[in-house]
C-alpha cells in the first residue's frame, strides 16, 4: 500500500524586469510518502515439492503449514522453514524544497540562465524481518543545495549553442536488511565478516556538464540537436549484497563517471517523406576503489560461512555502470500521402538498435552481460475522410529477433536472475475513433 501527497506552487513573471532583460520563476514543493510493505516470500527449502505456507493464509494446508514461535530460541526456526524472505516494513518520507530560476538577456543574441534549489528530505522506517527475529527503527535527514548555470548564444537566426553546468541530488534512505556489526558477530559466535550493507545509505549527487548545438537547416526543413555531456557521481546508489546471508540493500559507490554524445535529427526530405533519427553513445565506469560482493558468487556459502562470503569481494574500479549501453539508435522513415478519396495514408518504417550492456556493476559475465539486439517495425495507417475513424496495421519485431530487454539479479538470498525478454514478432490491428 502506497499513499503519496504532493503540493507544488509556482510564481512566474509575466513581464520581463530590468528593461525586458530578466524573466524569473520561484516556487516550492512538498511531498509526503508512506508505504506499507508486507512481503511473504516462499521457497521449497525441504524439497518436498509442496510449499509450507503460513497457517493464517487462506490457501495454506491445515496439516502442512507454518506457525511462528515468537519465543527464544523458537523464533529462529523460521530459517529452517520454507521461507525466502519475510518482512513487515513501514517506511515514510517527507520532502520539501524551495527554488528559483532567472533568465537574463546579456544581449539580443545571448542569455544566462541560473537556478538554485534547496531540498530537505526526512525518512523514517519501522522494519520487522522474519516475523520477530529482527526489528529496526531509524530516522534521518538529508539536505542539499543544487544549482544550474547555462549560457546560450545565438550563432545565427536558426542556430543556438549552449554550455550548461548542473548539480543534481538523490536523497539517502534506509534498508530493509543490512549486515551485522563485527561486535554482533563476536557476541553471536559467528565468523566475523564486516558489513557491506548498512542500516542507512547516503545521498547521491551528480555534477554534469553539457555542451550542445541546436540548429534549423535546409530552410527550416531539418532540425538538428547535438550534445556532449559528462556526469560525475558521488556516492552512486546501487543494489548490494552483504556477507550475512539473506541481507542486502542499497549501498554507495564513492566515485563514478559517465560521458556521452547524443544526436537528434529530424528532416522533411520531401513533402511526403520525413526522416527522424536519434543516436546515443555512452561510456561509463567506476573511478574509485570499491569492494563489492556478488551474490551469484556468494550463494554457495551460507550461515556459519560469512567470512568465506566476505572473502569473495571484488574491486569494481574500472567496471561499467549498470544498464548503460554503449550505443543506441532509433531511426524512422514516415511517408504520408492522400488517396483520391481523401483518406490520409501513413506508412512508418522503424529501426531500433539497443547496444549490449552490463546489468550490474559487478560485470559478472555469467549473468550481467546483456547482448545487443535490433528491431524492425512497420506501421500502415489510414485516417479516413472526416478524421473520425482510423485504422492501423502493425508488424512489430518483424524479423522475430530474440533479445533481452533487461534483467535483475536478487541481492538478498537466492541469487536468482530474472530476464525481461523483448516480445516476439507481433501482428496488430488497431481501430480508432475520435469523438
Task: Please give the residue ranges for each predicted region.
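Gram-negative outer-membrane beta-barrel transporters
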Residues: 12, 108, 112, 227-232, ...
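Membrane-embedded beta-barrel scaffold of Gram-negative outer-membrane proteins
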Residues: 154-162, 193, 198-261, 265-274, ...
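C-terminal beta-signal and adjacent terminal beta-strands/loops
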Residues: 275, 350-362, 382-435
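Transmembrane beta-strands of outer-membrane beta-barrel pores
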Residues: 28-34, 118-122, 165-171, 180, ...
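Structural signature of Gram-negative outer-membrane beta-barrels, strongest in the C-terminal barrel
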Residues: 11-14, 23-31, 89-231
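Outer-membrane beta-barrel channels and translocator barrels
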Residues: 2, 14-19, 107-109, 156-158, ...
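Transmembrane beta-strands of outer-membrane beta-barrel proteins
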Residues: 22-26, 112-114, 161, 222-226, ...
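Solvent-exposed loop segments that connect transmembrane elements
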Residues: 1, 40-86, 123-142, 173-200, ...
Amino acid at each position: 500500500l502506497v499513499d503519496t501527497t504532493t503540493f507544488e506552487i509556482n510564481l512566474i513573471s509575466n513581464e520581463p524586469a530590468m528593461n525586458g532583460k530578466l524573466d524569473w520563476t520561484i516556487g516550492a514543493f512538498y511531498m509526503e510518502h508512506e508505504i506499507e510493505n508486507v512481503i511473504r516470500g516462499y521457497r521449497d527449502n525441504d524439497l518436498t515439492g509442496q510449499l509450507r505456507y503460513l497457517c493464517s493464509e487462506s490457501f495454506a494446508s491445515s496439516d502442512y503449514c507454518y506457525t511462528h514461535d515468537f519465543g527464544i530460541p523458537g523464533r529462529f526456526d523460521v530459517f529452517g522453514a520454507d521461507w525466502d524472505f519475510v518482512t513487515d516494513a513501514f517506511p515514510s518520507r517527507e520532502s520539501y524544497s524551495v527554488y528559483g530560476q532567472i533568465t537574463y538577456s546579456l544581449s539580443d543574441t545571448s542569455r544566462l540562465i541560473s537556478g538554485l534549489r534547496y531540498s530537505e528530505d526526512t525518512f523514517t522506517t519501522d522494519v520487522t524481518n522474519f516475523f520477530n527475529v529482527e526489528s529496526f527503527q531509524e530516522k534521518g535527514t538529508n539536505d542539499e543545495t543544487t544549482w544550474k548555470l547555462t549560457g546560450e548564444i545565438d550563432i545565427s537566426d536558426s542556430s543556438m549553442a549552449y554550455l550548461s553546468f548542473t548539480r543534481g541530488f538523490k536523497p539517502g534512505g534506509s534498508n530493509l536488511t543490512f549486515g551485522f556489526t563485527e561486535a554482533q558477530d563476536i557476541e553471536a559466535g559467528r565468523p566475523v565478516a564486516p558489513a557491506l550493507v548498512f542500516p542507512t545509505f547516503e545521498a547521491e549527487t551528480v555534477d554534469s556538464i553539457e555542451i550542445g548545438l541546436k540548429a534549423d537547416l535546409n530552410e527550416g526543413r531539418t532540425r538538428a540537436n547535438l550534445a556532449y555531456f559528462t556526469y560525475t557521481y558521488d556516492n552512486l546508489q546501487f543494489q548490494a549484497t552483504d556477507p550475512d546471508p539473506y541481507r542486502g540493500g542499497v549501498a554507495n559507490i564513492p566515485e563514478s563517471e559517465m560521458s556521452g554524445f547524443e544526436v537528434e535529427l529530424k528532416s522533411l526530405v520531401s513533402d511526403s517523406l520525413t526522416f527522424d533519427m536519434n543516436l546515443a553513445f555512452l561510456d561509463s565506469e567506476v573511478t574509485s576503489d570499491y569492494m563489492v560482493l556478488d551474490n551469484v558468487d556468494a550463494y554457495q556459502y551460507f550461515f556459519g560461512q560469512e567470512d568465506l562470503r566476505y572473502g569473495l569481494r571484488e574491486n569494481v574500479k574500472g567496471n561499467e555502470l549498470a544498464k548503460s549501453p554503449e550505443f543506441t539508435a532509433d531511426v524512422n522513415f514516415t511517408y504520408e500521402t492522400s488517396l483520391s478519396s481523401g483518406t490520409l495514408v501513413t506508412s512508418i518504417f522503424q529501426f531500433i538498435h539497443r547496444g549490449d550492456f552490463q546489468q550490474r556493476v559487478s560485470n559478472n559475465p555469467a549473468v550481467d552481460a546483456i547482448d545487443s539486439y535490433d528491431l524492425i517495425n512497420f506501421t500502415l495507417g489510414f485516417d479516413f475522410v472526416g478524421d473520425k475513424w482510423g485504422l492501423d496495421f502493425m508488424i512489430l519485431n518483424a524479423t522475430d529477433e530474440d533479445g533481452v530487454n533487461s534483467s535483475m539479479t536478487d541481492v538478498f538470498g537466492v541469487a536468482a536472475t530474472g530476464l525481461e525478454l523483448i516480445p516476439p514478432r507481433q501482428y496488430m490491428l488497431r481501430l480508432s475513433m475520435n469523438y
